[in-house]
Amino acid sequence: MLVTRGDRGGGERAPSRRPRCGLVPAGAAALLAGASCLCYGRSLRGEFVHDDVWAIVNNPDVRPGTPLRWAIFANDFWGKGLADSTSHKSYRPLCVLSFRLNIFLTGMNPFYFHAVNVILHCLVTLVLMYTCDKTVFKNRGLAFVTALLFAVHPVHTEAVAGIVGRADVLACLLFLLAFLSYQRSLDQGCAGQCFPTTASPFFLLLSLFLGTCAMLVKETGITVFGVCLVYDLFSPSHKQDKLSNGAVCQHSSGQPGSPQPSSQQAHPHRESRKQRFPHKDSWGGCHSPLPPEPKSSGFPMSPRAMWSLMRCLTGSTNRNFLLTLRPFLKRAILVISYVTVILYFRLWIMGGTMPLFSEQDNPASFSPYILTRFLTYSYLLAFNVWLLLAPITLCYDWQVGSIPLVETIWDVRNLATILLAVVMALLSLHCVAAFKRLEHKEVLAGLLFLVFPFIPASNLFFRVGFVVAERVLYMPSMGYCILFVHGLSKLCAGLSRCGATSLMASTVLLLLLFSWKTVKQNEIWLSRESLFRSGVQTLPHNAKVHYNYANFLKDQGRNKEAIYHYRTALKLYPRHASALNNLGTLTKDMAEAKMYYQKALQLHPQHNRALFNLGNLLKSQEKTEEAIMLLKESIKYGPDFADAYSSLASLLAEQERFKEAEDIYQAGIKNCPDSSDLHNNYAVFLVDSGFPEKAVAHYQQAIQLSPSHHVAVVNLGRLYRSLGENSKAEEWYRRALKVARTAEVLSPLGALYYNTGRHKEALEVYREAVSLQPSQRELRLALAQVLAVMGQTKEAEKITSHIVSEEPRCLECYRLLSAIHSKQEHHGKALEAIEKALQLKPKDPKVISELFFTKGNQLREQNLLDKAFESYEAAVTLDPDQAQAWMNMGGIRHIQGSYVSARAYYERALKLVPDSKLLKENLAKLDRLERRLQEVRERDQT
């Protein structure tokens, strides 16, 4: 720990005696980078959690496979159009582009997303040290401690470990670079100017560019312009000359009213070589001699400083003051004009509207009482400062009951607000009193870096969508770190050596505690489960964290636990419409589910998902018209909700209202062009409607939008199979296996192999499918069927018999057993299996017809021809198009010598299958027999 310690007498240090830190810049940078990596190294193992899912995984502007479109500059951070009424209006296109670059270079691997965040945090830490060294402390040791405190502070965990926190981290980096560029643009060598001229327009323009980039990464980046201007105003870079009778400021030659330079200002260029950044001067030097300044009186503003300020702002010398202020005014006019333009652009691209938030997001802003809003907003400022001072309780979400409203002036929490107000007032007075002394710029810089970046989150100018958000403290924490280290150095200077050593040891301990806390917080951000569970443990009175944890549990299929946390959320916040809606989806009792949906709609009549769920429930109850109305309402209030379009269109198609279904699908694709599910469902509809060519295009679009959409890939394979393009079908099935090697994908591939005679490959595929889902009856039955065809009848019989023991009413099992026994020439067992199948009394006449036909075959094999004929007769009675049964009946009559009857049956079968060679051969045989009989009769007659 390197803290400089001034002379205890409080004397002013000479510029030439600037203390230096023993650390070389490279060593300090290595230590800071190492500390940052040690604290956040564990976050590299994290997955996409919380807002990452919506900003990256589900964001159409970020998703891999989607083309890079100009719409990225018209959409918000989550991929919605900024003009959309449901948009959060968070315009961060450069941050979104950084996500796209991540995906382009390394794919959707979260490791590299986290790695970029950690690297950016390291860079911010290093640039902060450089900034503090060159413009704030002019002391490398203090700058190092400031940056080290910033590097390990636990409140940064959300910004660094959460991938969407990149907006804050990258904006902070650009914020610092813009500030440094602004300082670099000032003339550091104008020895007598109260306000330096703009020496480098390039760096001034670069500052504007970097500040704009910071704003396009996150909105708070725009506050750098305010920091630059106020810092420029209150820390002028002229060189102060302290004379016994006052101070004189040198103006440029030829300027009216310019005093002559004093003897102490004879070597301005020598001084300018010593310091690149602002030099020491005062506004007091711009005027006539001032009264001698007495020794420090303990009052924050000395009489000399106050006299200087009064003379600057009033009196007969205002003309000279304005002349000295001219360089600053030029810069200020440029910056303010530029900020006005980009703010106008920002409002224009939002459609001139502000985001709409709910009471859950920011309860205080919905209070009807001005006093409640004022007291709560004020207390939240103190609460945020407390998070910086003592980051003990940290949580990813502070909404809905985390911080109760401050509704009365007698609330004890107002003491924290008053204390903060007093401290900020004293610090502000200190800045005003010491604005003419270089050694007191630390407090000014600390306050500016603390206050300005927090203004957009303060509810001062507009309502924000959160109560407290730890990641928005990433930028303001720079100011806190500067003030903390400055106060530490002042304390150290006023203590004895022993006291200073104890203070430094305490600081080291604090840094170690902060580091440990940061490492532990990183573990929380590793997965959705650990994050959401930590919220419940940290803020059990927060309804939102219970709701989020319940959502996670529902996704994991842990429904009982999910129901418990949904109900807990409702106890804490009974007006939580989404919790009621989700609770309804988990309830098995349809009446209870309907009650939950209706309650949700009473609280929020435009809740599109509750409308959707209630509509589907009524659809299942065959209340078609009510369901259609609710689904249309769901689309009305959620035009980007793709599931509602699919559900409504499928319902209309079931009602044979195909034109309306087509229109709904078209509207859905127009409003949700990036929904792969919607394209897939529309393709299924087109196949059923007889437009397979159009369906191919939508299947391919679904796959392009989501290459991992294995359902669309399999459906496309099935479509090609139905079109007879088996090679293409096999290609798509194999592609689906690369995405998801599941039984659902293996099954159609096995069927393709079986139906094309590739039985060995079919057997391998079905064996793998059964190993993945051994309990699925259809797969085991298909495997048994392949085994039977390949002659492995014993194994086939074993599998089929096992299925029958589990499901005695398995009709297909009995049919397969009959085929297996027939192949084994156990016709009695085959007949017995068919009899059992007939006893199940299937409803489909064609199925019964096939069973009678099979029974007839087994009877015929046992030479029970009359009974076989009866079975065939029963088959054709149920299904007159059963050509094989007609032919077999003809064959029996043929064998029995009833040739006339046989011919009738053969001819009936031939009408059904006119190209049957077997029938023609049988008829030819019958003709020959009849001719022989005729010849025999003729010979007998002769």
UniProtKB/Swiss-Prot annotation:
Catalytic reaction annotation: a di-trans,poly-cis-dolichyl beta-D-mannosyl phosphate + L-seryl-[protein] = 3-O-(alpha-D-mannosyl)-L-seryl-[protein] + a di-trans,poly-cis-dolichyl phosphate + H(+); a di-trans,poly-cis-dolichyl beta-D-mannosyl phosphate + L-threonyl-[protein] = 3-O-(alpha-D-mannosyl)-L-threonyl-[protein] + a di-trans,poly-cis-dolichyl phosphate + H(+)
TPR repeats: 543-576, 577-607, 608-641, 642-675, 676-709, 710-742, 743-776, 777-810, 811-844, 849-882, 883-916
Membrane topology note: Multi-pass membrane protein
Localization: Membrane; Endoplasmic reticulum
GO molecular function terms listed in the Swiss-Prot or TrEMBL record: dolichyl-phosphate-mannose-protein mannosyltransferase activity
Broad enzyme group: transferase
Biological-process GO terms, alphabetical: protein O-linked mannosylation; RNA processing
Phylogenetic lineage: Eukaryota, Metazoa, Chordata, Craniata, Vertebrata
Gene Ontology cellular component list: endoplasmic reticulum; membrane; mitochondrion
One family name in Pfam for this protein: TPR_12
The protein's name: Protein O-mannosyl-transferase TMTC1
Subunit structure: May interact with FAM168B.
Intervals, Extracellular compartment: 42-109, 158-159, 218-331, 395-414, 463, 520-942
Protein purpose: Transfers mannosyl residues to the hydroxyl group of serine or threonine residues. The 4 members of the TMTC family are O-mannosyl-transferases dedicated primarily to the cadherin superfamily, each member seems to have a distinct role in decorating the cadherin domains with O-linked mannose glycans at specific regions. Also acts as O-mannosyl-transferase on other proteins such as PDIA3.
Organism this protein belongs to: Mus musculus (Mouse)
UniProt family annotation: Belongs to the TMTC family.
Chain residue ranges for the region called Disordered: 245-285
Keywords from the named record: Endoplasmic reticulum, Membrane, Repeat, TPR repeat, Transferase, Transmembrane, Transmembrane helix
Topological domains, Cytoplasmic: 1-20, 131-140, 181-196, 353-373, 436-441, 485-498
Pathways involved: Protein modification; protein glycosylation
Chain intervals with Low complexity compositional bias: 250-266
Chief site of localization: membrane
EC number: 2.4.1.109
Membrane-spanning intervals of the chain: 21-41, 110-130, 141-157, 160-180, 197-217, 332-352, 374-394, 415-435, 442-462, 464-484, 499-519
Gene3D superfamilies membership: Tetratricopeptide repeat domain (1.25.40.10)
